[in-house]
Protein backbone atom coordinates (compact mmCIF):
# COMPACT_ATOMS: atom_id res chain seq x y z
CA UNK A 1 0.00 0.00 0.00
CA UNK A 2 1.55 3.33 -1.06
CA UNK A 3 1.40 6.49 1.05
CA UNK A 4 -1.60 8.02 -0.73
CA UNK A 5 -3.62 4.81 -0.45
CA UNK A 6 -2.66 4.65 3.21
CA UNK A 7 -3.83 8.25 3.69
CA UNK A 8 -7.18 7.40 2.08
CA UNK A 9 -7.72 4.37 4.32
CA UNK A 10 -6.63 6.29 7.44
CA UNK A 11 -9.09 9.11 6.76
CA UNK A 12 -11.91 6.69 5.95
CA UNK A 13 -11.39 4.69 9.13
CA UNK A 14 -11.40 7.92 11.13
CA UNK A 15 -14.57 9.18 9.44
CA UNK A 16 -16.33 5.84 9.89
CA UNK A 17 -15.42 5.63 13.59
CA UNK A 18 -13.11 2.65 13.22
CA UNK A 19 -10.03 4.39 14.64
CA UNK A 20 -11.99 6.45 17.19
CA UNK A 21 -15.22 5.98 19.14
CA UNK A 22 -18.75 7.35 18.86
CA UNK A 23 -20.61 6.59 22.08
CA UNK A 24 -24.07 7.73 20.91
CA UNK A 25 -25.81 5.43 18.41
CA UNK A 26 -28.02 8.31 17.25
CA UNK A 27 -25.03 10.47 16.38
CA UNK A 28 -23.34 7.47 14.77
CA UNK A 29 -26.31 6.85 12.50
CA UNK A 30 -26.62 10.55 11.66
CA UNK A 31 -22.94 10.91 10.79
CA UNK A 32 -22.91 7.73 8.68
CA UNK A 33 -26.25 8.60 7.01
CA UNK A 34 -27.82 5.44 8.40
CA UNK A 35 -26.66 2.03 9.63
CA UNK A 36 -27.16 -0.89 7.25
CA UNK A 37 -29.65 -3.41 8.67
CA UNK A 38 -30.42 -6.12 6.14
CA UNK A 39 -30.12 -8.18 9.33
CA UNK A 40 -30.88 -6.14 12.43
CA UNK A 41 -27.92 -7.59 14.29
CA UNK A 42 -25.66 -5.78 11.80
CA UNK A 43 -26.68 -2.55 13.53
CA UNK A 44 -25.79 -3.98 16.93
CA UNK A 45 -22.41 -5.24 15.73
CA UNK A 46 -21.60 -2.05 13.82
CA UNK A 47 -22.56 0.20 16.73
CA UNK A 48 -20.66 -1.85 19.32
CA UNK A 49 -17.53 -2.04 17.16
CA UNK A 50 -17.60 1.76 16.91
CA UNK A 51 -18.05 2.26 20.66
CA UNK A 52 -21.76 3.19 20.74
CA UNK A 53 -24.03 2.23 23.61
CA UNK A 54 -26.95 -0.04 22.80
CA UNK A 55 -29.47 0.94 25.48
CA UNK A 56 -32.82 1.52 23.78
CA UNK A 57 -31.33 0.97 20.34
CA UNK A 58 -34.46 -0.72 18.95
CA UNK A 59 -36.39 2.55 19.12
CA UNK A 60 -33.53 5.03 18.94
CA UNK A 61 -33.43 4.59 15.17
CA UNK A 62 -36.06 4.17 12.46
CA UNK A 63 -35.75 1.19 10.10
CA UNK A 64 -36.71 1.89 6.50
CA UNK A 65 -35.61 1.46 2.89
CA UNK A 66 -33.05 3.89 1.53
CA UNK A 67 -30.20 3.69 -0.96
CA UNK A 68 -30.70 1.14 -3.75
CA UNK A 69 -33.59 -0.42 -1.82
CA UNK A 70 -31.43 -1.37 1.18
CA UNK A 71 -32.69 -1.30 4.76
CA UNK A 72 -31.07 1.19 7.13
CA UNK A 73 -31.56 2.34 10.69
CA UNK A 74 -31.70 6.14 10.57
CA UNK A 75 -32.44 9.12 12.78
CA UNK A 76 -36.12 9.95 12.24
CA UNK A 77 -35.48 13.67 11.77
CA UNK A 78 -33.05 12.87 8.93
CA UNK A 79 -35.63 10.98 6.88
CA UNK A 80 -36.83 13.92 4.71
CA UNK A 81 -33.26 14.56 3.55
CA UNK A 82 -32.16 10.94 3.16
CA UNK A 83 -35.36 9.97 1.34
CA UNK A 84 -35.07 12.84 -1.14
CA UNK A 85 -33.26 10.82 -3.86
CA UNK A 86 -35.75 7.97 -3.51
CA UNK A 87 -39.15 9.67 -3.28
CA UNK A 88 -40.24 8.15 -6.60
CA UNK A 89 -38.66 4.73 -6.09
CA UNK A 90 -40.84 1.65 -6.29
CA UNK A 91 -40.27 -1.96 -5.34
CA UNK A 92 -39.95 -4.47 -8.16
CA UNK A 93 -43.26 -5.91 -6.95
CA UNK A 94 -44.89 -2.52 -7.55
CA UNK A 95 -43.53 -2.53 -11.09
CA UNK A 96 -44.95 -6.01 -11.64
CA UNK A 97 -48.33 -4.84 -10.36
CA UNK A 98 -48.40 -2.23 -13.13
CA UNK A 99 -48.64 -5.10 -15.60
CA UNK A 100 -51.84 -6.25 -13.89
CA UNK A 101 -53.66 -3.04 -12.95
CA UNK A 102 -53.58 0.67 -13.62
CA UNK A 103 -51.59 3.08 -11.47
CA UNK A 104 -54.87 4.65 -10.33
CA UNK A 105 -56.05 1.29 -9.04
CA UNK A 106 -52.71 0.68 -7.32
CA UNK A 107 -53.14 4.06 -5.63
CA UNK A 108 -56.60 2.99 -4.42
CA UNK A 109 -54.97 -0.06 -2.84
CA UNK A 110 -52.31 2.13 -1.24
CA UNK A 111 -54.95 4.48 0.17
CA UNK A 112 -56.82 1.50 1.61
CA UNK A 113 -53.63 0.17 3.24
CA UNK A 114 -52.93 3.56 4.81
CA UNK A 115 -56.52 3.68 6.08
CA UNK A 116 -56.20 0.22 7.63
CA UNK A 117 -52.98 1.23 9.34
CA UNK A 118 -54.77 4.25 10.74
CA UNK A 119 -57.27 1.79 12.21
CA UNK A 120 -54.49 -0.23 13.86
CA UNK A 121 -53.66 -2.92 11.28
CA UNK A 122 -49.87 -3.05 11.08
CA UNK A 123 -48.81 -6.49 9.86
CA UNK A 124 -48.55 -7.88 6.35
CA UNK A 125 -50.13 -11.13 7.54
CA UNK A 126 -53.28 -9.30 8.65
CA UNK A 127 -53.33 -7.30 5.42
CA UNK A 128 -53.16 -10.51 3.39
CA UNK A 129 -56.27 -11.84 5.12
CA UNK A 130 -58.19 -8.59 4.64
CA UNK A 131 -57.37 -8.35 0.92
CA UNK A 132 -57.73 -12.08 0.19
CA UNK A 133 -61.35 -11.89 -0.99
CA UNK A 134 -60.77 -8.93 -3.30
CA UNK A 135 -57.65 -9.85 -5.29
CA UNK A 136 -56.09 -12.91 -6.86
CA UNK A 137 -53.24 -14.58 -5.00
CA UNK A 138 -50.54 -13.24 -7.29
CA UNK A 139 -51.58 -9.65 -6.58
CA UNK A 140 -51.64 -10.35 -2.84
CA UNK A 141 -48.13 -11.82 -3.05
CA UNK A 142 -46.83 -8.74 -4.85
CA UNK A 143 -48.54 -6.30 -2.49
CA UNK A 144 -47.36 -7.92 0.71
CA UNK A 145 -44.12 -9.59 -0.34
CA UNK A 146 -41.68 -10.46 2.43
CA UNK A 147 -39.15 -8.35 0.49
CA UNK A 148 -41.27 -5.26 1.09
CA UNK A 149 -43.90 -5.14 -1.62
CA UNK A 150 -46.00 -2.01 -1.71
CA UNK A 151 -44.57 -0.89 1.65
CA UNK A 152 -41.31 0.01 -0.11
CA UNK A 153 -43.22 2.58 -2.15
CA UNK A 154 -44.88 3.96 0.98
CA UNK A 155 -41.57 4.06 2.83
CA UNK A 156 -39.87 5.97 0.02
CA UNK A 157 -42.70 8.51 0.24
CA UNK A 158 -42.02 8.93 3.95
CA UNK A 159 -45.42 7.50 4.92
CA UNK A 160 -44.47 4.26 6.69
CA UNK A 161 -41.51 2.69 8.49
CA UNK A 162 -40.98 -0.44 10.53
CA UNK A 163 -42.39 -0.25 14.07
CA UNK A 164 -38.91 -0.70 15.54
CA UNK A 165 -35.51 -2.00 14.50
CA UNK A 166 -36.44 -5.68 14.97
CA UNK A 167 -40.12 -5.62 13.99
CA UNK A 168 -41.60 -6.95 10.74
CA UNK A 169 -44.68 -4.74 11.18
CA UNK A 170 -45.15 -1.14 10.10
CA UNK A 171 -46.26 2.20 11.53
CA UNK A 172 -47.53 5.30 9.81
CA UNK A 173 -45.04 8.17 9.87
CA UNK A 174 -45.02 11.74 8.57
CA UNK A 175 -41.63 12.37 6.96
CA UNK A 176 -42.23 13.63 3.40
CA UNK A 177 -39.01 13.73 1.36
CA UNK A 178 -37.49 17.10 0.56
CA UNK A 179 -37.65 18.19 -3.08
CA UNK A 180 -34.57 16.86 -4.86
CA UNK A 181 -32.96 20.14 -5.91
CA UNK A 182 -29.30 21.18 -6.15
CA UNK A 183 -29.30 22.44 -2.55
CA UNK A 184 -30.49 19.09 -1.19
CA UNK A 185 -28.07 17.18 -3.39
CA UNK A 186 -25.18 19.39 -2.25
CA UNK A 187 -26.06 18.71 1.38
CA UNK A 188 -26.18 14.96 0.74
CA UNK A 189 -22.77 15.15 -0.92
CA UNK A 190 -21.32 17.23 1.90
CA UNK A 191 -22.49 14.72 4.48
CA UNK A 192 -21.29 11.77 2.43
CA UNK A 193 -17.78 13.12 1.92
CA UNK A 194 -17.55 14.26 5.57
CA UNK A 195 -18.03 10.67 6.75
CA UNK A 196 -16.87 8.53 3.84
CA UNK A 197 -14.18 10.68 2.26
CA UNK A 198 -11.77 10.55 0.66
CA UNK A 199 -14.13 9.20 -1.99
CA UNK A 200 -14.96 9.85 -5.63
CA UNK A 201 -18.14 11.16 -7.21
CA UNK A 202 -18.67 7.61 -8.51
CA UNK A 203 -18.58 6.41 -4.90
CA UNK A 204 -21.11 9.07 -3.90
CA UNK A 205 -23.42 8.13 -6.77
CA UNK A 206 -23.17 4.46 -5.80
CA UNK A 207 -23.87 5.15 -2.14
CA UNK A 208 -26.84 7.44 -2.80
CA UNK A 209 -28.28 5.25 -5.54
CA UNK A 210 -27.96 7.98 -8.17
CA UNK A 211 -26.83 8.03 -11.78
CA UNK A 212 -23.29 9.40 -11.85
CA UNK A 213 -24.37 11.84 -14.59
CA UNK A 214 -26.60 13.52 -11.98
CA UNK A 215 -23.46 14.70 -10.18
CA UNK A 216 -21.22 15.62 -13.10
CA UNK A 217 -22.46 19.19 -13.58
CA UNK A 218 -23.20 19.89 -9.92
CA UNK A 219 -20.69 22.24 -8.25
CA UNK A 220 -18.74 20.34 -5.61
CA UNK A 221 -19.27 21.96 -2.16
CA UNK A 222 -16.53 24.55 -1.62
CA UNK A 223 -15.55 23.27 1.83
CA UNK A 224 -14.36 19.96 0.40
CA UNK A 225 -10.66 19.22 -0.03
CA UNK A 226 -9.48 16.98 -2.84
CA UNK A 227 -6.63 14.71 -3.78
CA UNK A 228 -5.81 12.93 -7.02
CA UNK A 229 -4.99 9.25 -6.95
CA UNK A 230 -4.79 6.84 -9.85
CA UNK A 231 -7.34 8.03 -12.37
CA UNK A 232 -9.72 9.60 -9.86
CA UNK A 233 -10.32 12.71 -7.78
CA UNK A 234 -11.11 12.02 -4.14
CA UNK A 235 -13.06 14.51 -2.02
CA UNK A 236 -13.08 14.81 1.76
CA UNK A 237 -13.56 17.26 4.61
CA UNK A 238 -10.29 18.39 6.17
CA UNK A 239 -11.24 19.65 9.63
CA UNK A 240 -7.70 19.50 10.97
CA UNK A 241 -8.47 16.58 13.28
CA UNK A 242 -5.82 14.00 14.07
CA UNK A 243 -6.64 11.03 11.83
CA UNK A 244 -4.82 8.59 14.09
CA UNK A 245 -3.20 5.41 12.85
CA UNK A 246 -4.79 2.59 10.91
CA UNK A 247 -5.64 -0.01 13.58
CA UNK A 248 -3.56 -3.18 13.39
CA UNK A 249 -6.73 -5.24 13.82
CA UNK A 250 -10.36 -4.24 13.26
CA UNK A 251 -13.63 -6.13 13.36
CA UNK A 252 -16.07 -5.06 10.66
CA UNK A 253 -19.79 -5.79 10.80
CA UNK A 254 -21.78 -7.49 8.07
CA UNK A 255 -22.41 -4.92 5.31
CA UNK A 256 -19.85 -2.70 7.01
CA UNK A 257 -19.73 0.85 5.61
CA UNK A 258 -15.98 0.54 5.01
CA UNK A 259 -16.71 -2.14 2.40
CA UNK A 260 -20.16 -1.63 0.89
CA UNK A 261 -20.25 2.18 0.62
CA UNK A 262 -17.77 2.49 -2.23
CA UNK A 263 -17.94 1.69 -5.93
CA UNK A 264 -14.28 0.69 -5.91
CA UNK A 265 -13.45 -1.55 -2.93
CA UNK A 266 -10.07 -2.98 -3.88
CA UNK A 267 -8.08 -0.90 -1.40
CA UNK A 268 -9.91 -2.53 1.52
CA UNK A 269 -11.19 -5.80 0.04
CA UNK A 270 -8.54 -7.63 -2.03
CA UNK A 271 -10.00 -9.10 -5.21
CA UNK A 272 -8.96 -12.64 -4.28
CA UNK A 273 -11.14 -12.49 -1.14
CA UNK A 274 -14.17 -10.77 -2.65
CA UNK A 275 -16.21 -13.94 -3.32
CA UNK A 276 -15.57 -15.18 0.21
CA UNK A 277 -16.88 -11.92 1.70
CA UNK A 278 -19.71 -10.88 -0.65
CA UNK A 279 -21.89 -13.89 -1.45
CA UNK A 280 -23.87 -14.45 -4.65
CA UNK A 281 -27.01 -13.50 -2.70
CA UNK A 282 -25.52 -10.05 -2.11
CA UNK A 283 -24.91 -10.67 1.59
CA UNK A 284 -21.69 -9.11 2.89
CA UNK A 285 -20.27 -11.13 5.78
CA UNK A 286 -18.67 -9.77 8.97
CA UNK A 287 -14.93 -9.47 8.39
CA UNK A 288 -11.60 -8.96 10.12
CA UNK A 289 -9.28 -6.26 8.78
CA UNK A 290 -5.52 -6.38 9.38
CA UNK A 291 -3.84 -3.01 8.90
CA UNK A 292 -6.95 -1.72 7.15
CA UNK A 293 -7.38 -4.58 4.67
CA UNK A 294 -9.85 -7.45 4.91
CA UNK A 295 -7.98 -10.61 5.86
CA UNK A 296 -10.69 -12.95 7.14
CA UNK A 297 -14.28 -13.41 8.30
CA UNK A 298 -15.84 -13.78 11.74
CA UNK A 299 -19.26 -14.68 13.04
CA UNK A 300 -21.32 -15.80 16.00
CA UNK A 301 -22.70 -19.25 15.19
CA UNK A 302 -25.07 -20.75 17.74
CA UNK A 303 -23.74 -18.15 20.15
CA UNK A 304 -20.13 -19.24 19.66
CA UNK A 305 -17.45 -16.97 18.14
CA UNK A 306 -15.65 -18.09 14.99
CA UNK A 307 -12.76 -16.47 13.12
CA UNK A 308 -11.37 -17.68 9.79
CA UNK A 309 -8.40 -15.98 8.13
CA UNK A 310 -7.86 -16.33 4.39
CA UNK A 311 -4.08 -16.60 4.73
CA UNK A 312 -1.60 -17.37 7.49
CA UNK A 313 -1.46 -14.76 10.26
CA UNK A 314 0.84 -14.44 13.28
CA UNK A 315 -0.39 -16.13 16.45
CA UNK A 316 -0.80 -12.75 18.18
CA UNK A 317 -3.18 -11.58 15.42
CA UNK A 318 -5.23 -14.78 15.51
CA UNK A 319 -5.44 -14.64 19.30
CA UNK A 320 -6.36 -10.95 19.36
CA UNK A 321 -9.09 -11.45 16.74
CA UNK A 322 -10.61 -14.35 18.68
CA UNK A 323 -10.59 -12.23 21.84
CA UNK A 324 -12.30 -9.30 20.08
CA UNK A 325 -15.10 -11.52 18.77
CA UNK A 326 -15.52 -13.16 22.17
CA UNK A 327 -15.69 -9.74 23.86
CA UNK A 328 -18.31 -8.65 21.35
CA UNK A 329 -20.32 -11.80 22.01
CA UNK A 330 -20.57 -11.06 25.73
CA UNK A 331 -21.17 -7.35 25.22
CA UNK A 332 -24.19 -7.82 22.93
CA UNK A 333 -25.65 -10.82 24.75
CA UNK A 334 -29.36 -10.25 25.32
CA UNK A 335 -29.40 -7.34 22.87
CA UNK A 336 -30.13 -9.27 19.66
Region locations from a protein language model:
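Anionic-ligand-binding alpha/beta catalytic cores of soluble enzymes and soluble regulatory domains
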Residues: 194-243
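A short acidic, leucine-rich amphipathic alpha-helix
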Residues: 124-132, 201-205, 292
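A short, conserved structural fragment
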Residues: 58-71, 156-165, 223-229, 296-298
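Glycine-rich, small/acidic residue-mixed loop/short-helix segments
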Residues: 271, 277-283, 287-336
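Phosphate-backbone binding and catalysis cores of DNA-processing enzymes
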Residues: 1-130, 136-137
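Non-catalytic regulatory appendages
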Residues: 223-272
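Short, amphipathic alpha-helical interaction segments positioned at domain boundaries
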Residues: 83-97, 175-197, 249-253, 258-260
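Loop-centered beta-sheet repeat module
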Residues: 140-215
Amino acid sequence: MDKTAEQIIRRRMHGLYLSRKCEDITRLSRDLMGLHCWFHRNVVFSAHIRGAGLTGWKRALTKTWLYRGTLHGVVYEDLPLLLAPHARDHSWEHLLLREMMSEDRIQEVIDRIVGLMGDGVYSRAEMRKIFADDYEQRVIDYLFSSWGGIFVTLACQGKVAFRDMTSRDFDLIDAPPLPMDDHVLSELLRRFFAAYGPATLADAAWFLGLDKNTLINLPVPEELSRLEYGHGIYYYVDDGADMGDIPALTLLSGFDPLIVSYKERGAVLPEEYKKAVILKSGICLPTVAVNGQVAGIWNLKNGKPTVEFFASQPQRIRKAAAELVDELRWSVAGTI
